[in-house]
From Swiss-Prot:
Signal peptide from the UniProt entry: none
Protein name (Swiss-Prot/TrEMBL): Ranalexin-1Ca
Described purpose of this protein according to its UniProt entry: Antibacterial activity against Gram-positive bacterium S.aureus (MIC=17 uM) and Gram-negative bacterium E.coli (MIC=4 uM). Has activity against C.albicans (MIC=14 uM).
Coiled-coil segments on the chain, per record: none
Amino acid sequence: FLGGLMKAFPALICAVTKKC
């Protein structure tokens, strides 16, 4: 679970901040 969370976190930040 933790590994998946770390993998999804950057994508979440990208979606929220629109900075990819």
